[in-house]
Swiss-Prot record:
The UniProt record lists the keyword Cytoplasm: no
Source domain of life: Bacteria
The protein's name: Small ribosomal subunit protein bS21
Keywords for this protein: Ribonucleoprotein, Ribosomal protein
Native source organism of the sequence: Streptococcus pyogenes serotype M49 (strain NZ131)
C-alpha cells in the first residue's frame, strides 16, 4: 500500500502527483488489474508464451 503524507506548505496537487508516482512505481494498479478476474492456468501460460515470443521477435 502506497502512503503519502502531505508536507507542510505543499499543495494537494503536488501530494496527489507524488502519490500517483509512488503507486505506479510500486505496480499497484497493474497488480490489481491482473487480479481483477480469475485467469485459467492455460490462458495464463498462453499469454506468457505470447509475451516471450514478442520479446524474442524484436
Amino acid at each position: 500500500m502506497s502512503k503519502t503524507v502531505v508536507r507542510k506548505n505543499e499543495s494537494l496537487d503536488d501530494a496527489l502527483r507524488r502519490f500517483k508516482r509512488s503507486v505506479t512505481k510500486a505496480g499497484t494498479l497493474q497488480e490489481s488489474r491482473k487480479r481483477e478476474f480469475y485467469e485459467k492456468l492455460s490462458v495464463k501460460r498462453k499469454r506468457k508464451s505470447e509475451a516471450a515470443r514478442k520479446r524474442k521477435k524484436f
